[in-house]
Each structure stands twice: as C-alpha cells, then as structure tokens.
Amino acid sequence: MEHLLGKYATTDDGCREGTAEFEIRRGIVEGPNLLCILGAPKEAGPGQEAYEAKCTQKSQVHLGTITFDLSAKPDSLKITLPETADWLTLYPCK
C-alpha cells in the first residue's frame, strides 16, 4: 500500500490547478464526496491490490471491496469502489 500513497487527479495534468481530487493515505482513500476506510487485504487478480473497505459516498455507506489496478499504465492507476463496477483512472500529482 505504501507505493500508492499520495495525491491524484482524474485528469493527466499533474494537478496543475493546485488541488488534488483524490488522496490515498495509510488506510484511507479520500475524494470528492468520498471517504473510504480500508481494512484487511483481499485476494486480487494479477497487477491488482484489493482491500475490505467501508466507503461513505455523499450520505450513503457502502461495505465491500476497493480494488486498485496497477497494471494499466506506469503513470496511472485504476480504482473501483464498493457497489460499483466502473473503473476510475487516477493520475499522480507532480
């Protein structure tokens, strides 16, 4: 998990506007209207990491698995949240 820590944006502009949209800290993923508390690691596919998670999105709480896909590109990662099947691409701030 240590290698994922940092600030991220949903656009590949290096967070030039001065504010990151997402931040991954030890045990926490925070973004717009989103706060996920990460728990125990779970089995994941090749190039992926997965964790049990409790995510609050707006006013709803979701329990499930948060998955990080690190295999797509070296300059980005993909993340999927509990209760969703869509992948969100995040780019590190520079």
Task: Annotate each predicted stretch with a short phrase.
Residues 1, 41-46, 71-74, 94:
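A short, structured loop/turn motif at beta-sheet edges
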Residues 1-7, 24:
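N-terminal helix-cap/turn-to-beta initiation motif at the start of protein domains
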Residues 8-9, 48, 86:
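Residue-level signal for mature regions of secreted extracellular proteins and peptides
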Residues 9, 30, 94:
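Residue-level detector of conserved, well-ordered beta-strand and adjacent loop positions
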Residues 14-59:
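N-terminal glycine/threonine-rich, aromatic-flanked beta-hairpin/loop signature
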